Amino acid sequence: MVNDPPVPALLWAQEMGHVMAGRARKLLLQFGVFFCTILLLLWVSVFLYGSFYYSYMPTVSHLSPVHFHYRTDCESSTSLLCSFPVANVTLAKGGRDRVLMYGQPYRVTLELELPESPVNQDLGMFLVTISCYTRGGRIISTSSRSVMLHYRSSLLQMLDTLVFSSLLLFGFAEQKQLLEVELYPEYRENSYVPTTGAIIEIHSKRIQMYGAYLRIHAHFTGLRYLLYNFPMTCAFVGVASNFTFLSVIVLFSYMQWVWGGIWPRQRLSLQVNIRNRKRSRKDIQRKVSAHQPGPQGQEESPQLSPVTEDGESHADPSGTEGQLSEEEKTEQQPLSGEEELEPEASDGSGSWEDAALLTEANLAASGSAPAPETVGSSEPSAGSVRQRPICSSS
């Protein structure tokens, strides 16, 4: 009973259990890789959108306090100042980062906090001037605006004091006015001449103020308007677009790695025809010797005997025409494992330069050589003039 073989059903169940466990581990691993890939793509998409938003969107609003200063070394009454109040404002964050972005229109305003004192009420209109400068203190833009306190009658001031008397007593309200002076409705930064600061001057020696602030607000249009007024919608669309684009890239990369590519590479075969220049040269020599007219075509001059077709001298009459040397026979036989060479052109176009040189040499040599009557005779015929080759010293 103990040594009985296991039931086939149990063996099948064990095998199926192992197979299912392996498949479960494989599926779990694939799910983990897929989940990590999705998280990575999502993080990269958010990072790309955040980088684009940070680099594309300028500073929406910039508020800088304005501290006026004036001269005090003159002899004047207590109600008058020695000079106009002047302030120098730096348009940079921390002295390094610029506030203004190139090509972006800005609305520049000056906020003045003035008390409703009899001096300010009797002041009337006064002038506010701003001068923007670049590196080196060179003025690049100037603007001036006139301003005055809002008029309120004595009866209205009395009623206002009675209504807000409790708040005025406990310090929750003050009798002051906040004037907003628009200096530039649309100020654009020049990329070649950047603005580094501004000088603000109030043309009044009797003015009294609590404080002043320079506000720079960006006026957005186009894509920046959408990014500023609909930030959540634009963020969702931007992250979704980046995620889709990255997912398509990863999907195509996976298909290229697994299936070998959607568009398989086509193998390009390049056939190179190798020409035997030595053989073509000998063929050209054979054709030149065959075209020589008269008895000159029966034998060649001694000067061309080393380069004739059959490779032997014509002084030996036993030489047979058409017999090739062992070297030419070896060259004519095709090499083992290589394709036969393509037949050359009948006109010897493969090496036309060599053909031209050999033709001139053969014609010159054949024209100067004597024409014997027979091939085997060594004596010249009657009436023929024997010529000797003359070597020029040149």
Swiss-Prot record:
Q: Which GO terms describe its cellular component?
A: endoplasmic reticulum membrane; lipid droplet
Stretches of the chain found on the membrane's Lumenal side: 49-242
Carbohydrate attachment sites?
88, 242
Q: State the Pfam families in the record.
A: Seipin
Q: Which terms are listed as keywords in the entry?
A: Endoplasmic reticulum, Glycoprotein, Lipid degradation, Lipid droplet, Lipid metabolism, Membrane, Phosphoprotein, Transmembrane, Transmembrane helix
Alphabetical list of InterPro entries matching this protein: Seipin
Transmembrane domains' residue ranges: 28-48, 243-263
- Biological-process GO terms, alphabetical: fat cell differentiation; lipid catabolic process; lipid droplet formation; lipid droplet organization; lipid storage; negative regulation of lipid catabolic process
Renumbered to this chain, the Low complexity biased-composition regions fall at 292-303
The subcellular location is: Endoplasmic reticulum membrane; Lipid droplet
Identify residues that carry Phosphoserine. Answer: 289, 346, 351
What membrane topology does the UniProt entry give?
A: Multi-pass membrane protein
Cytoplasmic membrane side: 1-27, 264-394
**Stretch list, region Disordered:** 281-394
User: What is the stated purpose of this protein?
Assistant: Plays a crucial role in the formation of lipid droplets (LDs) which are storage organelles at the center of lipid and energy homeostasis. In association with LDAF1, defines the sites of LD formation in the ER. Also required for growth and maturation of small nascent LDs into larger mature LDs. Mediates the formation and/or stabilization of endoplasmic reticulum-lipid droplets (ER-LD) contacts, facilitating protein and lipid delivery from the ER into growing LDs.
Family the UniProt entry places it in: Belongs to the seipin family.
Q: How does it assemble?
A: Undecamer (an oligomer having eleven subunits). Oligomerization is important for its function in lipid droplet formation. Interacts with LDAF1 to form an oligomeric complex. Interacts with RAB18. Interacts with ZFYVE1 in a RAB18-dependent manner.
Recorded protein name is Seipin
Whose protein is this, by species? Answer: Bos taurus (Bovine)
